[in-house]
C-alpha cells in the first residue's frame, strides 16, 4: 500500500527552515552539544530548563548592588555619647574655670553628681534606642534653621543681651548672699539656666523673629491691659451702684 502523503510546504519554506536550524543566536551563542542518551538531560535553552531554574537568573540579576543601610550599633552609640558630651561641655568648662571640679564635695554634691550621671545614662539609652527618630528630626530642624540664617545676627544679639542681664543679676545675688558655698551654687545654677535659655532664645528668634521679645512684650501688655480694664469696669459698676441705690431695690 503506497503512502499518498504529500507535503503542503513549498520548497521555499523548506529552505527557510534549513537556514533557521543552522543560524546562531547572537545573544546566547552557539548551541552546545546535546547528548540525548543521558537521562534527564535537556538542552540548556529549552523552555523547560528556563521554567525550572528561575531563581538562578534572579540571583544573578540581584547579586550585586545590595547594601545594608542600617547604621552599626557602635556608630549609633558614639554619636549619642558625643551629643551628651557636647551638652555637658559648658558646665564642665565652667567648673574647671572656677577650679571647683570635684573639690570640697559633700554628701549633697555627690548625691547631685550621681543623679546627674544617672540622667546622662538614661539619656544615652534613650538616644541610642530612638536614634532614627531623633536624627531625622534634627536633620529637618537644621535644614529649616539654616533657611533663616539671616535672622541669626539679631538672635545672637538678643541672646547676648539676655546673658548680660542674667550675669548682672547673678553677681548681685552672689555678693548679697556672701556665703561662698551658696554663692557657688547660685553661680552654677545661674550659668546652667543662662546657657540653656540663651540657646533656646537664639533658636526661637532665628526661626521666628520676635517670638521671644516682641511677641512676649505684646502678650504681657495685652494681659495687663485686660486686667486693668477688668478692674476699671468693676470699680465703675460699684460706683454706679453706690450712686443709684434705688435701682438695686
From Swiss-Prot:
Main subcellular localization, coarse class? membrane
Region (Disordered) spans which residues?
1-40
Query: Bias regions of kind Basic and acidic residues — which residues?
Result: 19-30
By what name is this protein known? Meiotic drive suppressor wtf25
Q: How does it sit in the membrane?
A: Multi-pass membrane protein
Gene Ontology BP terms: meiotic drive
Q: Membrane spanning segments where?
A: 73-93, 110-130, 151-170, 187-207
Question: Which InterPro entries does this entry report, sorted A to Z?
Answer: WTF
Q: Say what the protein does.
A: Acts as a suppressor component of the dual wtf meiotic drive system, and can suppress but not confer meiotic drive by compatible poisons. Wtf meiotic drive systems promote unequal transmission of alleles from the parental zygote to progeny spores by encoding a poison and an antidote from the same locus; the poison is trans-acting and forms toxic aggregates in all spores within an ascus, wherease the antidote is spore-specific and targets aggregates for degradation by the vacuole.
Keywords, comma-separated and alphabetical = Membrane, Transmembrane, Transmembrane helix, Vacuole
Give the UniProt entry's GO cellular component terms. Answer: cytoplasm; nuclear envelope; vacuolar membrane
Q: Which domain of life is it from?
A: Eukaryota
Cell compartments where the protein resides = Spore membrane; Vacuole membrane
